[in-house]
Amino acid sequence: MEQVQAALNATADKATLTPQMQRMMNRQAENTKRVEETIKGTKSNPRWFVPLFCALMIIGLIWCVVYYLSPSGSWPIPNIGAWNLGIGFALIMIGFLMTMGWR
């Protein structure tokens, strides 16, 4: 086992490598550098972004379902009637619009 670890931890001398292996190692180093630069350049959303848009869509759905299931539209807000559907769909649409900004 120690011999395997020693072989894995050994570094290759570039003078002993074939030109093909040297080119392959150089390409790999360039690819690694390019990927690391790309990752550094990406922007990400705050941690609260995904739970917020999921919550908005779920609350909007629950709002619409409660309006449909309540007798004579007396819930969630009794005095506005069918505008309860507008509120529910607005919450859902805000959640969907937020998904477009998700990275």
UniProtKB/Swiss-Prot annotation:
It is found in: Cell membrane. It comes from the Bacteria. The chain crosses the membrane at residues 49-69, 80-100. Its main location: membrane. GO terms for cellular component: plasma membrane. Keywords: Cell cycle, Cell division, Cell membrane, Membrane, Transmembrane, Transmembrane helix. Belongs to the CrgA family. HAMAP family: CrgA. This is Cell division protein CrgA. It comes from Bifidobacterium longum (strain NCC 2705).
